[in-house]
């Protein structure tokens, strides 16, 4: 498969839509030649997360220093926590002849899309937005995680409604109503798109 290593794949969608599960299944497909660009965050580490595997966990001061040093391809702050993708992660993955996969929120995705558009490099992005079948199903998924209070769940749902409104900024939109079908559809999109020169 002929692949252009400067490509960048963005997988985005509201919290609770299943991005993490989809991403882990995509990464198991070695034919896609993709690797996850691990994000950095200042949020508290969940009990099952590992630093450098799930996220790079940074202090607020460390994160702000990296912002000042222009070390992020994108970053955002929501729910009082910073999230971002380090440029060094992208370069490292590309140096290994893989295509970076970014699983990020819509704010970060919009920032990257705008940046690439301004540089005339939009063709280097493959943007995929994951949609829930409904807001009610999204609420159920978030509640099942047992990591948020009711107030936090409601905040996430309001944010999700706003995020869904920007779905048309993404080249592809895929509804996650059946995990296997959703992953198969995304695999097909990636396989087709990364072969384009």
UniProtKB/Swiss-Prot annotation:
<keyword id="KW-0067">ATP-binding</keyword>
<dbReference type="GO" id="GO:0005524">
    <property type="term" value="F:ATP binding"/>
</dbReference>
<dbReference type="GO" id="GO:0005829">
    <property type="term" value="C:cytosol"/>
</dbReference>
<dbReference type="InterPro" id="IPR017665">
    <property type="entry name" value="Guanylate_kinase"/>
</dbReference>
<protein>
    <recommendedName>
        <fullName>Guanylate kinase</fullName>
        <ecNumber>2.7.4.8</ecNumber>
    </recommendedName>
</protein>
<comment type="similarity">
    <text>Belongs to the guanylate kinase family.</text>
</comment>
<keyword id="KW-0547">Nucleotide-binding</keyword>
<dbReference type="Pfam" id="PF00625">
    <property type="entry name" value="Guanylate_kin"/>
</dbReference>
<feature type="binding site">
    <location>
        <begin position="13"/>
        <end position="20"/>
    </location>
    <ligand>
        <name>ATP</name>
    </ligand>
</feature>
<keyword id="KW-0963">Cytoplasm</keyword>
<comment type="function">
    <text>Essential for recycling GMP and indirectly, cGMP.</text>
</comment>
<feature type="domain" description="Guanylate kinase-like">
    <location>
        <begin position="6"/>
        <end position="191"/>
    </location>
</feature>
<keyword id="KW-0808">Transferase</keyword>
<keyword id="KW-0418">Kinase</keyword>
<dbReference type="InterPro" id="IPR008144">
    <property type="entry name" value="Guanylate_kin-like_dom"/>
</dbReference>
<dbReference type="InterPro" id="IPR027417">
    <property type="entry name" value="P-loop_NTPase"/>
</dbReference>
<dbReference type="InterPro" id="IPR008145">
    <property type="entry name" value="GK/Ca_channel_bsu"/>
</dbReference>
<dbReference type="GO" id="GO:0004385">
    <property type="term" value="F:guanylate kinase activity"/>
</dbReference>
<dbReference type="InterPro" id="IPR020590">
    <property type="entry name" value="Guanylate_kinase_CS"/>
</dbReference>
């Amino acid at each position: 498969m002929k692949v252009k290593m400067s490509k960048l794949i963005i997988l985005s969608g509201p919290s609770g839509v299943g991005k993490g599960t989809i991403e882990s299944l995509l990464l198991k497909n070695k034919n896609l030649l993709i690797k996850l660009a691990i994000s950095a965050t200042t949020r508290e580490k969940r009990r099952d997360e590992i630093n450098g595997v799930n996220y790079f966990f940074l202090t607020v001061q460390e994160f702000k220093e990296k912002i000042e040093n222009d070390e992020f391809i994108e970053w955002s702050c929501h729910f009082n926590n910073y999230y971002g993708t380090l440029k060094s992660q992208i370069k490292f993955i590309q140096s290994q002849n893989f295509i970076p996969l970014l699983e990020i929120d819509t704010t970060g995705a919009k920032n990257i899309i705008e940046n690439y558009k301004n540089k005339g490099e939009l063709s280097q992005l493959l943007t995929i937005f994951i949609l829930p079948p409904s807001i009610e199903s999204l609420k159920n998924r978030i509640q099942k995680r047992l990591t948020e209070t009711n107030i936090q769940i409601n905040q996430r749902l309001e944010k999700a409604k706003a995020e869904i409104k920007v779905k048309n900024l993404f080249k592809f939109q895929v509804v996650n109503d059946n995990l296997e079908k959703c992953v198969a559809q995304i695999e097909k999109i990636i396989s087709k798109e990364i072969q384009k020169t």
